[in-house]
Amino acid sequence: MESSTEGAPYRQLKAWAESRDLAVLIYKLCFRRAKTIDRGLADQIRRAAISIPSNIAEGNGRGTNRDSLRFLYIARGSLCELESQIDVCLRAGLIEAGDSRNVTDQMALVGRLIGGLISYRKSRPD
């Protein structure tokens, strides 16, 4: 059976695809580091990570650029939250520099893509 979201327009957005990949990286990292990252922090990290593609998708499903922008700003805020949490984990020795580098590179890419999408949406009339 084909998913009703298989052809959803948000799936065409590179920002969504890369943020989904970031969320997968984060989930895998939290699973691998389950013994070093406490449960509460891991839950918060996962929530911030999954919020990014979720808000991009929801915003893209809205009818106006204004609505879409609101959700893109929320996605960008969640990305900032995630960046802060990963930085704390690295400085506390809860994750290794190699893990952090992969995630940091992906977060930077997602940030650029969200910024580009925000600029595009701002330039479009409702």
Where would I find each of the regions flagged by the language model?
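Amphipathic alpha-helical assembly/interaction segments
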Residues: 1-126
